[in-house]
């Protein structure tokens, strides 16, 4: 609920988990990317978006496997706070900062504080990489035919030049989980 006691929720009525809000005409979609704005809804306790009044909201969403973070206003413009991160969870905010658990392909999960004015990121806890970032392979999105549709994944190219490293494949047991482009 927002400060005007209007209900805000996520629904997949349009094919993606997207924000909707109560209005005089019933439940209406909020302006949003054609992308999922939440992980599987049976993973309870997630905070992936927050209403900010007058149809503005803070949200994380996933496009081509990579997470994004931004404030979307009623006119549809987005103030993008994604930076170098690719996964955002447990969103909170105040007048000055956005707080969340964020991770990237080269840094593990960290509690971060992001300035709403200059987008400066402060790591409050965690996020210590076990290797220098230049030694960590970065994921590339990958789509390939599977059954009657498309499967999606990430390819991590070798950081060793011509030396072929072993192939590591992560398969999730969906639909309850997914793979994310983050160091874990």
Each predicted region: which residue ranges?
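A flexible loop/linker signature enriched in serine peptidases of the S9 family
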Residues: 8-21, 32-43, 60-68, 84-85, ...
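Hydrophobic beta-strand positions that form the internal "hydrophobic ladder"
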Residues: 6-8, 56-58, 98
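Short strand-connecting beta-turns/loops that link adjacent beta-strands
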Residues: 3-4, 12-15, 24, 54, ...
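Hydrophobic beta-strand positions in blades of beta-propellers and related beta-sheet-rich domains
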Residues: 19-21, 27, 49, 68-71, ...
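Serine-hydrolase catalytic core recognition
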Residues: 4, 89-97, 101-184
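Multi-bladed beta-propeller domains
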Residues: 1-2, 11-12, 22-47, 72-89, ...
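Secondary-structure boundary/capping motif
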Residues: 19, 28-32, 49, 68, ...
């Amino acid at each position: 609920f927002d400060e005007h006691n209007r209900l805000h929720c996520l629904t997949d009525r349009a094919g993606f988990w997207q924000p909707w809000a109560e209005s005089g005409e019933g439940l209406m979609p909020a302006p949003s990317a054609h992308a999922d704005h939440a992980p599987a809804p049976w993973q309870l306790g997630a905070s992936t978006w927050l209403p900010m009044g007058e149809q503005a909201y803070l949200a994380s969403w996933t496009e081509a496997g990579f997470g994004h973070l931004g404030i979307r206003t009623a006119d549809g413009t987005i103030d993008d706070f994604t930076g170098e991160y690719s996964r955002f969870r447990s969103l909170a905010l105040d007048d000055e900062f956005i707080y969340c658990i964020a991770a990237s392909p080269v840094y593990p999960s960290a509690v971060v504080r992001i300035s709403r004015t200059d987008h400066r990121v402060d790591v409050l806890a965690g996020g210590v990489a076990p290797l220098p970032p230049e030694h960590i392979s970065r994921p590339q999105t990958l789509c390939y035919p599977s059954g009657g549709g498309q499967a999606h994944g990430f390819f991590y190219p070798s950081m060793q030049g011509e030396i072929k490293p072993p192939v590591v494949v992560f398969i999730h047991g969906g639909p309850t989980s997914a793979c994310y482009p983050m160091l874990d």
